[in-house]
Amino acid sequence: MIRITDAAQEHFLKLLAKQEEGTQIRVFVINPGTPNAECGVSYCPPDAVEASDTVLKFEKISAYVDELSAPYLEDAEIDFVTDQLGSQLTLKAPNAKMRKVDDSAPLMERVEYVLQSQINPQLAGHGGRVTLMEITDDGMAILQFGGGCNGCSMVDYTLKEGIEKELLEKFPELKGVRDLTEHQRGEHSYY
């Protein structure tokens, strides 16, 4: 479910040494399965453990996950990274905003999952997003761009060289992608 690197475990171990005996960590998702999902880590003293919690035992620490957050923390990773500028704890949870979809799920759901968990986080850096509108009978994924992608001069490149390549690689049953957005250049456009 969650991978916690050795560096992160060492970091937590130092922090937990200053807490009440028996305290571990809790990993959670607020607003799971929504675009507003946020992940967090907090202390979990012994009296805060719920019967429905999942206990993840690692080499140096244990982590508790509440029942609601668990499916959204699938494939999550916590790391502690140190570089010339300092150090920081990172929590990557690719399924926090959308529950992981099974390989046997309908094509529409699998494509939507990839868009939401892999493509849109990249587009969000430019204030953009893409939505799957439909998959045609001839295998075309019809997409609509929004935010900073609407009217962006790089949208064709993003569509063909980024999104289409990634989707065709993951879903050989697709034949291509098409953009149905009525692009209007404005202050919202990234380029």
Swiss-Prot record:
Q: Which SUPFAM superfamilies match?
A: Fe-S cluster assembly (FSCA) domain-like, HesB-like domain
Name the GO terms of the biological process aspect. iron-sulfur cluster assembly; protein maturation
Cofactor comment text: Binds 1 [4Fe-4S] cluster per subunit. The cluster is presumably bound at the interface of two monomers.
Q: Which UniProt keywords apply?
A: 4Fe-4S, Iron, Iron-sulfur, Metal-binding
Q: Does the keyword Ligase apply?
A: no
Family, per the entry?
Answer: Belongs to the NfuA family.
Cofactors: [4Fe-4S] cluster
Self-association or partners: how does it assemble? Homodimer.
Instruction: Quote the NCBIfam families the UniProt record gives.
Output: PRK11190.1 (NF008392), YhgI_GntY (TIGR03341)
InterPro entries for the chain: Fe/S_biogenesis_protein_NfuA, FeS_biogenesis, FSCA_dom_sf, HesB-like_dom_sf, NIF_FeS_clus_asmbl_NifU_C
Q: Where does [4Fe-4S] cluster bind?
A: C149, C152
- Nucleotide-binding is among the record's keywords: no
Question: What is its biological role?
Answer: Involved in iron-sulfur cluster biogenesis. Binds a 4Fe-4S cluster, can transfer this cluster to apoproteins, and thereby intervenes in the maturation of Fe/S proteins. Could also act as a scaffold/chaperone for damaged Fe/S proteins.
Name any one GO molecular function: 4 iron, 4 sulfur cluster binding
Q: Which Pfam families match?
A: Fe-S_biosyn (PF01521), NifU (PF01106)
Its name, as the record gives it, is Fe/S biogenesis protein NfuA
